[in-house]
Amino acid sequence: MDLKNKTVMVVGTGISGIGAVDLLNKVGADCILYDGNEKLDRQKVQEKLGDNKAEIIIGAFDEALLSKIDLLVISPGVPIDSPIVLTFKNAGIPVWGEIELAYNYDKGKIIAITGTNGKTTTTALVGQIIAAYNEKTFVVGNIGNSYTGEVLKTSEDSYTVAEISSFQLETVHEFHPIVSAILNITPDHLNRHHTMECYAWTKERISENQTKADTCVLNLEDKYLTDFAPECKANVVWFSSERKPSVGAYVDGEMIKYTDGTNDYDMLNVHDMNLLGKHNYENVCAAIAMTKAAGIPDDIIIEQVKKFKAVEHRIEYVATKNGVDYYNDSKGTNPEAAVKAIEAMVKPTILIGGGYDKGSEFDLYVKAFKDKVKLLVLIGQTSAKIADTCKKYGFENIEYADSMEQVVDICAKNAVSGDAVLLSPACASWGMFDNYEQRGRIFKDLVNNL
């Protein structure tokens, strides 16, 4: 859609909304920036806009404006069943998210990654591999820069490697990657998607516009994805940490291999990698399958996998203080992600958990404590819920904190040389922190100042 001289309303005044306005200004659209939060300071919103131009509307929305608006662009935090979105849909006005908006201007090849866990690490690794092959590579999403901020730099010979959330996939229409991947589907964001079936369907939309000329990489150990595979419109390639697939990357003992269906190829030994944990073997297998599908030579793939180091906030080594290793896994925002971090620990571990309640259950989280966790330090809204689950399974060594400062103090006082301290909350950061990045960086600053 050519948006020049069209009137576009953007909902949300956060990073995503401001980024959308910036792109729309550059392509010649007329913008309205709307946020229903009446408490917002108009002047601060104007300052966020900088040199960008948009009519700012805060609070109530006048439906008389509908007749002049050609397109609604919503931020990921705006549910598609919210009143403002339904008003536009009922009026027959298209509703896009930031992914669809950016895709409208992407001239290059797109590689897109989603999944409940592992997105950031896999996106970073795929981005590093592709960039070693072609310097015109843009890594976008929760990692790196925003898609809307980078898209006008793309060209016919460029690559975009995009990390995409379920919230963003709710609003795709024509988005078409040449290679997509769904890493896994486990319970998350059920306060938004309501059911696992709806959540899984939303994730699967990443391949909705693909054809058999494209590739969709799926996890052979995920039942949602093995059930989805026959319906997938793309050519399916698998990855697995447990067994050899028909076609794809897999772990065989200490070797990561690739099979094309006829021949098997050794890629690298797991001990040649800098990443901790079995879940990272899965991430590497997914990245290998994706980059081979994109036509990247094996020698470049192997070299970059060996060079790759953990991303910030994902089982990130922070420091050793008084013989105690501290790890930041603030990106572990659901129980399944946190379990993988716990499993990666090889020393007696003091675990920091809790945060905003997304409707998760914590049984798997607590079950993972056995023979791993010596003390649990709880913080945030879910403290009582997690503690109740601990009682259910007989885990009683729990302390509580009201701030990250208290958390780190408790950990430092209880840890002995040879222990590990792991921040892997199994919950979102909202309420106490702006985002998981802020939570992780505050933790790291406090640890480094011990």
Curated annotation (Swiss-Prot):
Chief location category: cytoplasm
Protein origin, superkingdom: Bacteria
E.C. number(s) listed in UniProt: 6.3.2.9
Family membership noted in the UniProt record: Belongs to the MurCDEF family.
Entry function: Cell wall formation. Catalyzes the addition of glutamate to the nucleotide precursor UDP-N-acetylmuramoyl-L-alanine (UMA).
Subcellular location: Cytoplasm
Pathway: Cell wall biogenesis; peptidoglycan biosynthesis
Classification via NCBIfam families: murD
GO terms, biological process: cell division; cell wall organization; peptidoglycan biosynthetic process; regulation of cell shape
Positions of ATP binding: G115, T116, N117, G118, K119, T120, T121
Protein name, per record: UDP-N-acetylmuramoylalanine--D-glutamate ligase
Catalyzed reaction equations: UDP-N-acetyl-alpha-D-muramoyl-L-alanine + D-glutamate + ATP = UDP-N-acetyl-alpha-D-muramoyl-L-alanyl-D-glutamate + ADP + phosphate + H(+)
UniProt key word Ligase: yes
Entry annotated with the keyword Cell membrane: no
GO CC annotations on file: cytoplasm
